[in-house]
Amino acid sequence: MANVTVIGSQWGDEGKGKIVDWLASRADAVVRFQGGHNAGHTLVVGEQVYKLSLLPSGIVTGTLSIIGNGVVLDPWALRDEITKLRGQGVEINADNFAIADNCALILPFHRDLDALRETAAGAGKIGTTGRGIGPAYEDKVGRRAIRVCDLAHLDHLEPQLDRLTAHHDALRAGFGEPPIDRDKLVADLREIADYVLEYAQPVWKRLKKVRKAGARILFEGAQGVLLDIDHGTYPFVTSSNTVSGTAASGSGLGPGAVGFVLGIAKAYTTRVGSGPFPTELEDETGQRLGERGHEFGTVTGRKRRCGWFDAVLVRQSCAVSGVTGIALTKLDVLDGFDTIRICTGYRLRGKILDYFPAHAADQAAVEPIYEEMDGWHESTAGARSYADLPAQAIKYIQRVQELIETPIALVSTSPEREDTILIRDPFSD
């Protein structure tokens, strides 16, 4: 049986939630492998709308859902999200949900530090969600983190607290903040420990068993390749690797488990927060894309920046992440445009580039080279086969496929799960 890894091929917010939900109904396990509760997914199932930030999308369908070791976990955010979903009738228990016991925790002072840094940065801020993701990853890499398994040993936490407070109290002092209240922190952890430990286990072992049984595993990425700590628009990136290879290291399975890599890309481009955006439209066209696409962040509610499809960026994302096929989403947002543009290259100080440069100053300076196509005025909303699409919409899909040098495997034409045109089944490979 084939496994499938779903990743964002742009700056996140590509519609991964709908695609993962669609695939999860055919998977035996769904795994989150990086990020934290900074990655919002909106799922629409019938009349019910589910907003997830931390839990794998498979939880809504009752599929075994796993938070892998590559995720940083806010235990209080976890409890809030589970409580909300249970209120919507979703069943969550230790049989269908598991957390890696070696996950690093996001703690209250991580959120504090995130907010303090963003405020101090002023106009130079990164645009984080302020949820402590970056500082938690810093502590993980710095070997200071408190992990899920430590919640079962809170009476022996002193050495870790010494390392944590020595680091963070110095940072807090620089911002004029008081030291961490160790007693309160331990009390808060005692209060939440049993709740988290109910789901904690060596998930690599459970996944090994699932894989050995020939079951289908769906790896659910968060954010997008252009926010990858190495391959993204550094420093305007997230704090983890978002490329497909992280599915292996972030879950406890080897690289052979990654399977079919399905990249998700909107039929246009959006970005939330700061950072370079070559095709950004700050005119009526950009506003129209945002309004038609309802472009507001699931987690922050921030308005997303909008622009034309950038084939250079998506082609690069596909290359560095080994994308097997693309799911093109929100095609219906382009309905009604007389002319549609696609970025096919860049100009940078008199030179033509067919790739996105690494240096921040170069990224900010590139000018898009556009190819124009006729648009279409018929509706694509709800289309479920190529026969339902206008001829120009099909030409657009084909041209995108040529430019990104990667096959289009799926086309999504609305937030509804069934409104999907399947060209190549990821699970059949």
UniProtKB/Swiss-Prot annotation:
Catalytic activity: IMP + L-aspartate + GTP = N(6)-(1,2-dicarboxyethyl)-AMP + GDP + phosphate + 2 H(+)
Any GO CC annotation of this UniProt entry: cytoplasm
UniProt cofactor note: Binds 1 Mg(2+) ion per subunit.
SMART domains (UniProt xref): Adenylsucc_synt (SM00788)
Pathway where this protein functions: Purine metabolism; AMP biosynthesis via de novo pathway; AMP from IMP: step 1/2
NCBIfam families in the cross-refs: PRK01117.1, purA
Protein's name according to its UniProt entry: Adenylosuccinate synthetase
The encoding gene: purA
